[in-house]
C-alpha cells in the first residue's frame, strides 16, 4: 500500500540518517498516516490521511456505532 495521504497527496521524501561520525546513509521519511473513517459521496469509507490534514480539519471523522 502506498504511503500517500488521500487528501493532500503527501508522500515519502528521501534524505539521510547521519551517525555521530557523520556517516550518511540514504533513508525514506514517511508521512504520519492514520486510518480514518469519513463520508465520501454519502458512503462511509476508510482513508489513510496524514496528521497535518486531520489537525487542519480537512477531514471530518464519522462516529461508528
Swiss-Prot record:
Give a GO cellular-component term.
Answer: ribonucleoprotein complex
Q: Supply the InterPro entries for this chain.
A: Bacterial_rp_bL28, Ribosomal_bL28, Ribosomal_bL28/bL31-like_sf, Ribosomal_bL28_bact-type, Ribosomal_bL28_sf
Molecular functions (GO terms)? structural constituent of ribosome
Q: Which domain of life is it from?
A: Bacteria
| Gene3D superfamilies, alphabetized | Ribosomal protein L28/L24
Instruction: Give the UniProt keywords, A-Z.
Output: Ribonucleoprotein, Ribosomal protein
Kindly give the Pfam families that the UniProt entry links to this protein.
Answer: Ribosomal_L28
Kindly state a single biological-process term from the GO annotations of this entry: translation
Query: PANTHER family per the record?
Result: 50S RIBOSOMAL PROTEIN L28, LARGE RIBOSOMAL SUBUNIT PROTEIN BL28A
Per the record, the similarity remark reads: Belongs to the bacterial ribosomal protein bL28 family.
What is the protein name given in its UniProt record?
Large ribosomal subunit protein bL28
Amino acid at each position: 500500500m502506498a504511503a500517500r495521504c488521500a487528501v493532500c497527496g503527501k508522500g515519502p521524501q528521501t534524505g539521510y540518517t547521519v551517525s555521530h561520525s557523520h556517516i550518511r546513509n540514504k533513508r525514506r521519511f514517511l508521512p504520519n498516516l492514520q486510518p480514518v473513517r469519513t463520508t465520501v459521496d454519502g458512503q462511509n469509507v476508510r482513508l489513510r490521511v496524514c496528521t497535518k490534514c486531520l489537525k487542519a480539519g480537512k477531514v471530518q471523522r464519522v462516529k461508528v456505532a
